[in-house]
UniProtKB/Swiss-Prot annotation:
PANTHER family assigned: DISCO-INTERACTING PROTEIN 2 (PTHR22754:SF32), DISCO-INTERACTING PROTEIN 2 DIP2 -RELATED (PTHR22754)
Protein name: Long-chain-fatty-acid--AMP ligase FadD23
Membrane topology: Multi-pass membrane protein
Disruption phenotype: Disruption of fadD23 increases binding affinity to human macrophage-like cell THP-1 and shows a lack of sulfolipid 1 production as compared to wild-type.
Length: 584
């Protein structure tokens, strides 16, 4: 029996479309207009086998191969070559400096790679990052672009059934103690079946023949890896790719690449929709028709309904269809995907009383009032339940609890972390409802609720702000702030004299134009909005320059680090109001 795996499905693509274009990478670093380089399926396969042959010289089946390379075709070939060799791939970012490199160091210590795959351009930066303490042998480092990648195939095909883990997807949480989620081919293929059923429900769960993937997401992030590298192989379609830097430099490039001939399927976090709506100008979009875009998935972080509306309103004149925007929920522990909005319909937004939410209950309110949340149909696969984490019993509709997930897409656990694996992946329900399995359940650590047979997400339980005894979602408070400032912000609770006080860190653009009057205006507007919408007073509003708020490698705010920086008075304030010791 032929096992289904990424390498075996790559072979199928070669058999069906040997000369078809597989991956096209647009390099905007060498030329601002973009230099395009493409590989056919045959070329991808040949290069993958040659990388695998080199990898097998240094490591055995089941060993770890870390990929530390810039975004590009070499990264894809390195990742696929590691899989083809039967190793466990560990995708990481190229060394960037700062907290990013701390994370790389921690992952290397945890994964203990037997070989490192990189490129010649950054070899000098990579070697110090993977050099172990004295007395421990360094893993060999291979520059894949220096191999004779297009030589006659010289690698044997590995029996995929021998592999229990395909790759380790390290989470973007703690920098110093990262956890590697063990993803199997069974997880990947199950998750793709779930995604295809949901995203193409309006076309009989069959992707259109002219579908292509467009992604600028980093390959070391779960959504970027699954969408940019795995999806083209599993779906059997081409991909047009570029880098996160290319997007950040000119967000309009994202729209331009999606408007190519064919039906684009893309994805991005919420901030990308906000940035594109604000920065893309009509001159960049002249002549573009966005009407053929099949799907733009919005996930990886809390989805703000107001951001999606701004995005659609901004680009509807270029024929962007509202139902092409698909809010989504997922996490690395479930491979990547759990739920999305209804196919063929605009995102459905419901409104709830903020004070009831802070008390643990979901009470609907009039449209346009209260807290706006995206509505998701409860998926049949995977199974989702809202659970009281203290009693392990299912919550009734309208009661906030922890989101638990059960399905073949849920990973087996964390690499060499049995205790954390049991806590996170070993959930068992007490007296489950009819048709609901006892376990095992993935405890996501996210809070949510069910209302009128729809599923709603609030945010990370560990990030909940407890102010004067009531729970408040930092995501909701940050959404309120961003409606005024349009920039990154962080809502944190800081202990002070036995209670926790709300502090907001707010990044403001156009530093040169930030006079006292504007700073005062922003302060008044933000504090008033938080008071009106959430019934909270802001103990301190910290105005800072862009880039001041620490984030993870996937762009999420590191709130615990924000608390630390605030308490140590390490934010450089634009309002020149340093924290006093007496304030704590």
């Amino acid at each position: 029996m032929v096992s289904l795996s990424i390498p075996s499905m790559l072979r199928q693509c070669v058999n069906l479309h040997p000369d078809g274009t597989a991956f096209t990478y647009i390099d905007y670093e060498r030329d601002s207009e973009g230099i395009s380089e493409s590989l056919t399926w045959s070329q991808v396969y040949r290069r993958t086998l040659n990388v695998a042959a080199e990898v097998r010289r240094h490591a055995a089946i089941g060993d770890r191969a870390v990929i530390l390379a810039p975004q590009g075709l070499d990264y894809i070939v390195a990742f696929l070559g590691a899989l083809q060799a039967g190793l466990i791939a560990v995708p990481l970012s190229a060394p960037l400096g700062g907290a990013s490199d701390e994370r790389v160091d921690a992952v290397v210590r945890d994964a203990k790679p037997n070989v490192v795959l990189t490129t010649s351009a950054i070899m000098g930066d990579v070697v110090p990052r993977v050099t172990p303490p004295p007395g421990i042998a360094s893993p060999p480092t291979v520059a894949v672009d220096q191999l004779d990648l297009d030589s006659p195939i010289r690698s044997n095909i590995v029996d995929d059934s021998l592999q229990t883990t395909a790759y380790l997807q390290y989470t973007s949480g703690s920098t110093r103690t990262p956890a590697g989620v063990m993803i199997t081919y069974k997880n990947i293929l199950a998750n793709f079946q779930q995604m295809i059923s949901a995203y193409f429900a309006d076309t009989g769960a069959v992707p259109p023949l002219d579908l292509f993937i467009m992604s600028w997401l980093p390959f070391y992030h779960d959504m970027g890896l699954v969408l940019g590298v795995c999806a083209p192989i599993i779906v059997g379609c081409g991909a047009v790719l570029t880098s996160p830097v290319a997007f950040l430099q000119r967000p309009a490039r994202w729209l331009q690449l999606m408007a190519r001939e064919g039906q684009a399927f893309s994805a991005a976090p919420n901030f990308a929709f906000e940035l594109t709506a604000a920065k893309a100008i009509d001159d960049d979009l002249a002549g573009l028709d966005l009407g053929r875009i099949k799907t733009i998935l919005c996930g990886s972080e809390r989805v703000h309904p107001a951001t999606l509306k701004r995005f659609v309103d901004r680009f509807s004149r270029f024929n962007l269809r509202e139902f092409a925007i698909r809010p989504a929920y997922g996490l690395a522990e479930a491979t990547v995907y759990v739920a999305t909005s209804q196919a063929g319909q605009p995102p459905e937004i419901r409104y709830f009383e903020p004070h009831e939410l802070s008390a643990g209950q979901a009470k609907p309110c009039a449209t346009g009032a209260g807290t706006a949340l995206v509505s998701y149909p409860l998926p049949q696969s995977p199974i989702v339940r809202i659970v009281d984490p203290n009693t392990n019993t299912e919550c009734p509709p309208g009661t906030i609890g922890e989101i638990w997930v059960h399905g073949d897409n849920v990973a087996g656990g964390y690499w060499e972390k049995p205790d954390e694996t049991e806590r996170t992946f070993g959930g068992a329900l007490v007296a489950p409802s009819a048709g609901t399995p006892v376990g095992p359940w993935l405890r996501t650590g996210d809070s949510g609720f069910v209302s009128e047979d729809k599923f709603f997400i609030i945010g990370r339980i560990k990030d909940l702000l407890i102010v004067y005894g009531r729970n408040h979602s930092p995501d909701d408070i940050e959404a309120t702030i961003q409606e005024i400032t349009r920039g990154r912000c962080a809502a944190i609770a800081v202990p002070s004299n036995g209670v926790e006080k709300l502090v907001a860190i707010v990044e403001l653009n156009n530093r040169g134009n930030l006079d006292t009057e504007r700073l005062s205006f922003v302060t008044r507007e933000v504090t008033s909005a938080i008071s009106t919408s959430h019934g909270l007073s802001v103990s301190d509003l910290v105005l800072v320059a862009p880039g001041s708020i620490p984030i993870t490698t996937s762009g999420k705010v590191r709130r615990a680090e924000c608390v630390k920086l605030y308490r140590h008075n390490e934010f450089t304030r634009l309002d020149a109001k340093p924290l006093q010791a007496s304030d704590l």
